[in-house]
């Protein structure tokens, strides 16, 4: 390849890569929109269709293990953490992975019941494409991911809640 073509080829490759990321975010945004509607309407079937419960429970288990197995933690706490992380994460998942719990999280971030749910293009603009093919949403454009979605058999499903776990509370 001659030196003149190298910058042109690089620009073309970057353009193609950006187009893929945009298509990915637009595709994901349709399912994210459906999840937001399910949360707002307390639609358990639609919510479950857009949530990977097993992945979220695994994440809870990992967080429990990270805390209980941390350096300096006493042996009793480590043993209890190792023995109870999986059953506790399953129980917590049953209680917390529900539309009304995620509605409380949405309200914390400013989405009230009377707030219009953004359309697919607005959601796509708020999503960040991740190097591993997933997408995530952050409170601020350059901020950390709060929730992450993965394409599972053609449906973008919530696979990770990266925000503060203390926000996941049963409604009172």
Please describe what each predicted stretch is.
Residues 51-128:
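Short solvent-exposed beta->alpha transition segments
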Residues 28-49:
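Post-signal peptide N-terminal segment of mature Sec-exported envelope proteins
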Residues 1-9:
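Bacterial N-terminal signal peptides that target proteins for export
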Residues 21-24:
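Bacterial signal peptide processing site
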Residues 93-172:
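Exposed beta-sheet edge and beta->alpha loop/turn motif
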Residues 16-19:
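C-terminal motif of bacterial Sec signal peptides marking the signal peptidase cleavage site
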């Amino acid at each position: 390849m001659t030196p003149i073509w190298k910058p042109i080829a690089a620009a073309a490759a970057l353009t193609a890569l950006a187009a893929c990321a945009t298509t990915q975010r637009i595709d994901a945004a349709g399912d994210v929109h459906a999840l937001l509607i399910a949360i707002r309407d307390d639609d358990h079937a639609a919510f479950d269709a857009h949530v990977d419960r097993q992945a979220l429970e695994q994440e809870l288990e990992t967080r429990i293990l990270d805390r209980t197995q941390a350096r300096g933690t006493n042996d009793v706490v480590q043993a209890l953490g190792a023995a109870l992380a999986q059953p506790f994460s399953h129980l917590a998942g049953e209680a917390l992975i529900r539309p009304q719990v995620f509605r409380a999280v949405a309200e914390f971030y400013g989405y009230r019941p009377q707030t219009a749910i953004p359309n697919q293009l607005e959601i796509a603009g708020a999503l960040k494409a991740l190097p591993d093919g997933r997408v995530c949403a952050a409170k601020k454009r350059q901020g950390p991911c709060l929730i992450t979605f993965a394409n599972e058999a053609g449906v973008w499903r919530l696979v990770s809640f990266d925000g503060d776990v203390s926000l996941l509370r049963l409604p009172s």
